[in-house]
Amino acid sequence: AWKCLPKDSTCGDDCDCCEGLHCHCPLRNMLPAILRCSCQSKDDHINTCPKYKKS
């Protein structure tokens, strides 16, 4: 079965991360060549993946 990625795991988008986490890319605007995104749990961000939307 598919499992979500825990905090600090490298990710491609919010859907890779577990609910409550979001895929954070701190270097997105500075160094695209070494882009490294990771699942984080910052309070001011939410996971926007459709699979976690509450019905």
UniProtKB/Swiss-Prot annotation:
The presence of a 'disulfide through disulfide knot' structurally defines this protein as a knottin. Expressed by the venom gland. GO terms for cellular component: extracellular region. This is Omega-oxotoxin-Ol1b. It comes from the Eukaryota. PROSITE patterns: OXYTX_ICK (PS51861). Transmembrane segments: none annotated. Weak blocker of vertebrate P/Q-, N- and L-type voltage-gated calcium channels (Cav1 and Cav2). Is both paralytic and lethal when injected into lepidopteran larvae. Is not toxic to mice. The modification Serine amide is found at residue 55. Belongs to the spiderine family. Spiderine subfamily. Keywords: Amidation, Calcium channel impairing toxin, Disulfide bond, Ion channel impairing toxin, Knottin, Neurotoxin, Secreted, Toxin, Voltage-gated calcium channel impairing toxin. InterPro entries: OXYTX_ICK. One of its GO terms (molecular function) is toxin activity. The keyword DNA-binding does not apply. Disulfide bonds join 4-18, 11-23, 15-49, 17-39, 25-37. It comes from Oxyopes lineatus. It is found in: Secreted. The keyword Secreted applies. Residues 1-53 form the Oxytoxin-type inhibitor cystine knot (ICK) domain.
